[in-house]
Amino acid sequence: MSESQSELDKYGTNLTKTAATNKLDPVIGRDAEIRRVCQILSRRTKNNPVLIGSAGVGKTAIVEGLAQRIVAGDVPESLRNKEIVSLDLSALLAGASYRGEFEKRVKNLLEEIQKSKVIIFIDEVHTLMSAGAAEGAIAAGNMLKPLLARGELRLIGATTLDEYREHLEKDPALERRFQQVFVGEPNLEDCIAIMRGLKERYEAHHKVSISDTALVTAVELSSRYITGRQLPDKAIDLLDEAASSLRMEIDSSPVELDQLRREVDRLRLEELALKSENDPTSEQRLRSITNQLSGKQEMLNTLQASWNSERARLNQIGALKEQIDIAKQSADIAQREGRLEDASRLLYATIPQLQKNLAEKLEEQDSAPLVSDQVMPEDIASVVEGWTGIPVKKLMQKDAKQLLHLEEDLSKSVIAQKVAIGVIADAVRRSRAGLSDPNRPSGTFLFLGPTGVGKTQLVKALASLLYDGEIVRIDMSEYSEKFSISRLIGAPPGYIGHESAGQLTESVRRRPYSVVLFDEAEKAHPEVFDILLQVLDEGRLTDSHGRTVDFRNTIIVLTSNIGSRYLSDISLEATTAHEYVNDEVRRTFRPEFLNRLDEIVIFEPLSQSDICQIVDLNIESLNKRIKDRRIVVTVSEDLRRWLSKSGYDVIYGARPLRRLIQREIEDRLAKLIIEGLIHDGQTASFDLSGGAVNAQVCS
């Protein structure tokens, strides 16, 4: 018996013993699932529940909750004094190198389980199907079937929906011996209750306090922004990482102290260097440095003393919280074991005294502490931003100011398209203020207009300003064939390339906060737009692997040249031209597609005065490219007017101007640099003389 018991201890973990020492996290809710598991375990035959649900919904927690109820005696009579042992199949397999050794281990283990009447829990129960099944050996699942059928072995399994379908359903003989218990994702209210139940454990572990608003924020933000994972797992992860980050900040130096220490070190180095100099300027500088160093050192000493005192107080608070948590666990164990005297001493003497000491320490807090010891919603938002790249933190003053002046900033890069700029800016402000529909993309637009008027440039400018340059560009001319749709979402199963991800879905899955640009939309096959209907309406798209990709934090822009000939026709009035363009759009795209767009924006052709401003933009862009060489390019007013006149074309927009500047200015500048006629720090001045462009180098 002792030898067999050692086998059970070797390959399993006793969850009831762990629960008896209060080492398991409290399980909040899930009463219906735990009751259903108890009902199945109380059956005469086929008393083997299998918990089925997505990863992270709390299947293992239900078994831990059952173990806690067994310890507390809150179970039916048939389950009282039972033990739940979590079996580790990998430990059972490890080292079984000889044929028959694995089967012998399983047989000995099963005999011991039958004698001791423990309940076995196997996480990832689908691994039973393949465990040990090599070179003609019998799989563990086949060895368990007779015992499971007779009810001589009580087994709780846990697996995901996909693994259950893929492994257990393929073996009907094994599947019928299990009773399914579906575990769904908890709703937001239940998840918040779960988080509140776990709050004290995480406070004691990280030695910080967690505000209730942070718990609610963790649930709400994880539900909205973190896709592909389930509650409550993702919300708990958010809270854990935010608390860990705060603890690390407390254990290290505050930013103010660190900056001041670096400043003092820099001044000391400069002081040492100046002591070896004898000239009057150096001596004067040395006196100034010495005075600065004296003042900074005094500030550093004061701040360091304040921080040492504050850190000691925070550590004492953390230690008191940990002691309270341990005392509460000890009181629970004492009550359960009938040691009422010990329990009353802990509950009515030790714990109240510790709580009183904690309250006194909390009152000692400074009005302006160097670092906070409380996890706030902003800390949760910072973690979400780190995971997803989505700026979900509350709008700072700098961000708000930038959003209010977004039109001005965009107008610096895109000339003369005020309507389009206004529409885009309004969509961004709605999204950042939290007013846009949470189940749709931040904005969906169709940009129409002649070539070279700034359709793509506006998208690039927006991405540069607000999205850190994150732009997913899909060139629709590459999707002119019907079968090319598979490149967007991935090839279907059985086709070459199924393992490769879709060009669109994978880009957005990796960067959910970005601008998605479908360039030259009219060149794509009409059926390509069918897959965009779900994106435009619901903000989601399922790829070829069945993964749902979230588009709710993207701005989607389609550009097209449809009807541009009407806009370039100077004989037509603007309203008439717009009507012709809209008619052609309706003929090209299906009504259900157009009806899902937020706005159809028509870009106007550029005028002569607009081209003059674009000349300045191009010269400014050139100066940025050669900034490292410290060379500056200037253009005379005559040359500026000549460039705008010669580079103006109502049909081709601003692109001919770019080619003209490249030919007349950039090519000449390149020759000057290569010939060594212009050096770093000099200015290249371009002007017009006798109808030809001349370059002059100035110091």
Swiss-Prot record:
Coiled coil: 236-367
Gene Ontology molecular functions: ATP binding; ATP hydrolysis activity
Signal peptide interval: none
Keywords: ATP-binding, Chaperone, Coiled coil, Cytoplasm, Nucleotide-binding, Repeat, Stress response
Chief location bin: cytoplasm
Binding-site residues for ATP 1, renumbered to this chain: G53, S54, A55, G56, V57, G58, K59, T60
Function, in words: Part of a stress-induced multi-chaperone system, it is involved in the recovery of the cell from heat-induced damage, in cooperation with DnaK, DnaJ and GrpE. Acts before DnaK, in the processing of protein aggregates. Protein binding stimulates the ATPase activity; ATP hydrolysis unfolds the denatured protein aggregates, which probably helps expose new hydrophobic binding sites on the surface of ClpB-bound aggregates, contributing to the solubilization and refolding of denatured protein aggregates by DnaK.
Family annotation (PANTHER family): ATP-DEPENDENT CLP PROTEASE, HEAT SHOCK PROTEIN 104
Protein name: Chaperone protein ClpB
Organism listed in the record: Tropheryma whipplei (strain TW08/27)
Lineage, broadest ranks: Bacteria, Bacillati, Actinomycetota, Actinomycetes, Micrococcales
